[in-house]
Each structure stands twice: as structure tokens, then as C-alpha cells.
């Protein structure tokens, strides 16, 4: 009798496998980091083969730690860093180039050329997204144009494209020996190639971006049985696939219209459930697919994507050597009462929502001799909260409904200083659930629903519990004064790259 569901959570900096029981509790977790490759300023790559190796290692590790027998696992789900682009040879399984990561800005010129006819919102009515370096379509075009011989192979059906979900599921189900080449609607909605109404690849956009349809995966529901695993999970159904932010929405049980969550990881991503129709944004948000369970109707979302939040803490740790462990930032930040009047705008990959300015670059403004490392650490945490406020304001305008509380998850939600400042600068309560790693949980839920381990989404609501709630403690005058300073600081980053 199957008692558990497994999930592979492949993120920007690490891969983990988590095993959950029927109540959504974590039974075991194993996690490993992978190499970040920076060939040029603005370029970010990963080695797809390293990611596949790490995936196999963490599956083995989680099984070993849990003591769970393979026969006790009902299904395995996959969730992934979205938009990151892999192209590989069908016959050998060998990538033709490193994975181009979502943060990578090398496709700036491709996006600018595409925008010359119709502007940045040229494809938005069909795909819900602005032309930006963030999304997969231009990354595929770059690989086809810049890696010798690949375009010819693509046109002959000899190479395959996938985001990380597709790459992992293809390998997990056999790879060159019959691996399944699929993606789900949530990941496909981030390529800039899928029509939100038809839930199919859009031939007009494929023609404009010069992407052969033959290399694209089949688009499937987020909860469905795609194939059977090989290796450590031999014979287990691979049955759930969600982009990481949609998985977090699902794991937070935001199944009703108007429910929202914010995930704090490498970047920050706020998603609002808008129901069964795509809602166009007038305020710099993305219209995207939330999830699709089997043959049930598709659920759509508005999303505010912030490129750099946790990655700013990593930068202070790795590049400036401010501390040895990311968790230490809270201690330094708490050594001062405020940021000393400075703001850090971490536009390392340009600015995402609500600005969509790929030519912005990072800045620290307001520096004086008074400023110490502690002030910089505090300003780094505050930058995450300010960016979230900008997205929440946009979401309130688009939806016409003011959010009354924010569910949060991800690694940074254990930083109490950040969470309190977040509640202060939003003016609404911030709520952390008992299982904060909701991304993996969402993928597990999707896989479990596909095989009947859970019967329906309402069964999952009972698993959600509140761990902690932060209430606003800042007066409104201070809140607006600080936020006004942030808005001024952001303008200093615009148009930095010619």
C-alpha cells in the first residue's frame, strides 16, 4: 500500500528530493547545490548534465534517509526553475549548449528586434507576457542562431527543447531509451510560445521567432501520469509537473479566486489566482497559467516576478564576503536600527515586474561615511520587501481587490527581521505555513492527485496550517516616507546599459 509521494524540486541554485506523507508532512529531504556559470556579464548558465546527476543523487539520498521502500511511493512529481532553456540531441541525450538560465540577459538584442514591430507587448494578447530576456522563446532562438549546426538539426527533428521539467522528466522516464518529451501548461506558459486560450504552441509566434515545432515538447496537464520512472524509482508513475511558482501556489492551497502567495527564493514571485479566464494586466504583471488538473478546466493567475532577492544575499556572501552563511545576514542587519538612509536596488538582471527594463543595473544609493556593513545587510533585506510592495500595489490595481493578508513561503521566510519589515511596508499581515517548502509540496500534491493518492483539491486544504503571523507595527507616515525613497532610488537604475 502506497503511503507516500515524492517530489523533485529543481531550483536555481540547488536540487532537492522531498518525500511527503498523506497529511503533507515532510518525511525526508535531500538537497545538493550545483554550479553557477557566469561566462560574461549578464550571462548565467547551468550544466544540464550536472543537474541530472544531482537529481539522481538527491532521489537516492531522500530514499535512504527516509527508510521508505520504493513500493510505498505512489508517484513522483517534478517542479522546476522556470524559463531556463535546455536543447539536447535526441539520439545521445547530450546538451548542445549549457542551460541558459532565466536570469540571463543575453537575448536583449533579440527582444529589441522583435519589439520593433509592435513594441514590448507585441505578443502579450496571446501569451500574457511582455518581450523580455526572462522568457524561453528568445533563448531558444539564441541557441539556434549561435551554436553551429543546431538549427539544421532542429529542423530535422534531431534535437529537443525543454525547460528543466522537460529535461528531467525525459531523463527520469528513460532518456534515449524511450524518455517522454512533455511539459505542463504552467511551464509552457512561460516560454512566450504558448497561446493562453488554445493551450497549444502558437504557430505565428514560432514563425516569427524561427523556432521549429518539431523540437517542442507535448503540452500536458499539471497532474497526469506522463510515464514510469527508471532508476531508483523504477516503475513509479511520474505524474506531476508544475513550474516552481505555480507549484508553491498549489502547495499553499490557493485554489480560490483572489487567493495569493509570495515565494522568497533566488527571486520573489507573487501569484494571484484569477480563476478560469486569463486576466490581462495593465500594471506590469504577467498573465500566466496557474495549473490544470487532469481534464478539469485550466486555472489562470496574475504574477509579479522579481528577479533578485535571495540572490542579493548570495552576492553579499560570495562576491563581497560579508558573511560565510546566508542566514548570518539577519544578525548583521539587527545590529542597526535602520538602513541609515541607503537603498539597494538589485537590478543585476535588469528590473522585472512592474518595470520590465532589461537595461537597468544595480545600485546602492544614499551612501555616506556613516554607512557600515550592517546597514548594507539591512538594506539588502529591505530591498526584498520594497520590491514585493511594488508588485502587491500592481496586483491590487489589476484585480480591483485589495489583498488583506499575504501567504509566504521559501527559504527567506525564516528571517524574522525581513518578515516583520515586509508586514510593515505592506500594511497587511504576513503568514508563514507549517510546511514552508510549499514548492515541492505542490508538485507532490499534483502527482498524488493524478494517481488518486488524494481524491480532490479540497482534501489538500485540511493539510495547510499556520506556523507564524507577522502584523504591521509601522505607522503609515513612516511606511510611505520609506517607500517614497525606494521609488526614487529605483529611477536611478534606469537606462544604464546603452
UniProtKB/Swiss-Prot annotation:
Q: Per the record, what are the reactions this protein catalyses? A: glycerol + ATP = sn-glycerol 3-phosphate + ADP + H(+)
Pfam families membership: FGGY_C, FGGY_N
- Does the record bear Electron transport in its keywords? no
The EC number(s) this enzyme carries = 2.7.1.30
A GO cellular component annotated for this chain's UniProt record is: cytosol
Give the regulation of activity. Answer: Inhibited by fructose 1,6-bisphosphate (FBP).
Which residues does the annotation say bind ATP?
12-14, 266, 310, 314, 411
Please give one Gene Ontology molecular function term for this protein.
Answer: glycerol kinase activity
Q: Which residues form the signal peptide?
A: none
Residues binding ADP are 12, 16, 266, 310, 411, 415
Q: Which pathway, per its entry?
A: Polyol metabolism; glycerol degradation via glycerol kinase pathway; sn-glycerol 3-phosphate from glycerol: step 1/1
Keywords of this protein's UniProt record, alphabetized? ATP-binding, Glycerol metabolism, Kinase, Nucleotide-binding, Transferase
List positions binding sn-glycerol 3-phosphate. 12, 82-83, 134, 244
Write out the GO biological process terms.
glycerol catabolic process; glycerol metabolic process; glycerol-3-phosphate metabolic process
Q: Which SUPFAM superfamilies match?
A: Actin-like ATPase domain
Could you say which residues bind glycerol here? 82-83, 134, 244-245
Q: Which PANTHER family match?
A: GLYCEROL KINASE, SUGAR KINASE
Give the UniProt family note: Belongs to the FGGY kinase family.
Instruction: Tell me the function of this protein.
Output: Key enzyme in the regulation of glycerol uptake and metabolism. Catalyzes the phosphorylation of glycerol to yield sn-glycerol 3-phosphate.
Protein name listed in UniProt: Glycerol kinase
The top of its lineage is:
Bacteria, Bacillati, Chloroflexota, Chloroflexia, Chloroflexales
Amino acid at each position: 500500500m502506497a503511503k507516500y509521494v515524492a517530489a523533485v524540486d529543481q531550483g536555481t541554485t540547488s536540487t532537492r528530493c522531498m518525500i511527503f506523507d498523506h497529511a503533507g508532512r515532510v518525511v525526508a529531504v535531500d538537497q545538493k547545490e550545483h554550479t553557477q556559470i557566469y561566462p560574461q556579464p549578464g550571462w548565467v548558465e547551468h550544466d544540464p548534465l550536472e543537474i541530472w546527476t544531482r537529481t539522481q543523487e538527491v532521489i537516492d539520498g531522500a530514499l535512504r534517509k527516509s527508510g521508505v521502500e520504493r513500493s510505498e511511493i505512489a508517484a513522483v512529481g517534478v517542479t522546476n526553475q522556470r524559463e531556463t532553456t535546455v536543447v539536447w540531441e535526441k539520439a545521445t541525450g547530450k546538451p548542445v549548449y549549457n542551460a541558459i538560465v532565466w536570469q540571463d540577459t543575453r537575448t536583449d538584442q533579440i527582444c529589441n528586434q522583435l519589439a520593433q514591430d509592435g513594441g514590448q507587448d507585441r505578443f502579450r494578447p496571446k501569451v500574457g507576457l511582455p518581450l523580455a530576456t526572462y522568457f524561453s522563446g528568445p533563448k531558444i532562438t539564441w541557441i539556434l542562431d549561435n551554436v553551429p549546426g543546431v538549427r539544421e538539426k532542429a529542423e530535422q527533428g534531431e534535437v529537443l527543447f525543454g525547460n528543466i521539467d522537460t529535461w528531467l522528466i525525459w531523463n527520469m522516464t528513460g532518456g534515449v531509451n524511450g524518455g517522454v518529451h512533455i511539459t505542463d501548461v504552467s511551464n509552457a506558459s512561460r516560454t512566450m510560445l504558448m497561446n493562453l486560450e488554445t493551450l497549444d504552441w502558437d504557430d505565428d509566434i514560432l514563425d516569427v521567432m524561427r523556432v521549429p515545432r518539431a523540437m517542442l515538447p507535448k503540452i500536458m496537464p499539471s497532474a497526469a501520469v506522463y510515464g514510469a520512472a527508471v532508476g531508483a524509482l523504477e516503475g513509479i508513475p511520474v505524474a506531476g509537473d508544475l513550474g516552481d511558482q505555480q507549484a508553491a501556489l498549489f502547495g499553499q492551497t490557493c485554489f480560490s479566486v483572489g487567493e495569493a502567495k509570495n515565494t522568497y527564493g533566488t527571486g520573489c514571485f507573487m501569484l494571484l489566482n484569477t480563476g478560469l479566464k486569463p486576466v490581462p494586466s495593465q500594471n506590469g504583471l504577467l498573465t500566466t497559467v496557474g495549473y490544470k488538473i487532469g481534464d478539469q478546466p485550466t486555472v489562470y493567475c496574475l504574477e509579479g516576478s522579481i528577479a533578485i532577492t535571495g540572490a542579493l544575499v548570495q552576492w553579499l556572501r560570495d562576491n563581497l564576503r560579508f558573511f560565510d552563511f546566508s542566514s548570518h545576514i539577519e544578525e548583521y542587519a539587527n545590529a542597526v536600527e535602520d538602513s541609515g538612509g541607503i537603498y539597494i536596488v538589485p537590478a543585476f538582471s535588469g528590473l522585472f515586474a512592474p518595470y520590465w527594463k532589461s537595461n537597468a543595473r544595480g545600485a546602492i544609493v544614499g551612501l555616506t561615511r556613516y554607512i557600515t556593513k550592517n546597514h548594507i545587510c539591512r538594506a539588502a533585506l529591505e530591498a526584498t520587501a520594497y520590491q514585493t510592495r511594488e508588485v502587491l500595489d500592481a496586483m491590487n490595481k489589476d484585480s480591483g481587490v485589495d489583498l488583506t493578508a499575504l501567504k509566504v513561503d521559501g527559504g527567506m521566510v525564516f528571517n524574522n527581521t525581513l518578515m516583520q519589515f515586509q508586514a510593515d511596508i505592506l500594511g497587511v499581515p504576513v503568514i508563514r505555513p507549517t510546511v514552508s517548502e510549499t514548492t515541492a509540496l505542490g508538485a507532490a500534491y499534483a502527482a498524488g492527485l493524478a494517481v488518486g493518492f488524494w481524491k480532490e483539491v479540497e482534501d489538500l486544504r485540511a493539510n495547510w496550517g499556520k506556523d507564524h503571523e507577522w502584523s504591521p507595527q509601522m505607522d503609515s507616515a513612516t511606511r510611505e516616507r520609506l517607500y517614497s525613497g525606494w521609488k526614487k532610488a529605483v529611477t536611478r537604475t534606469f537606462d544604464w546599459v546603452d
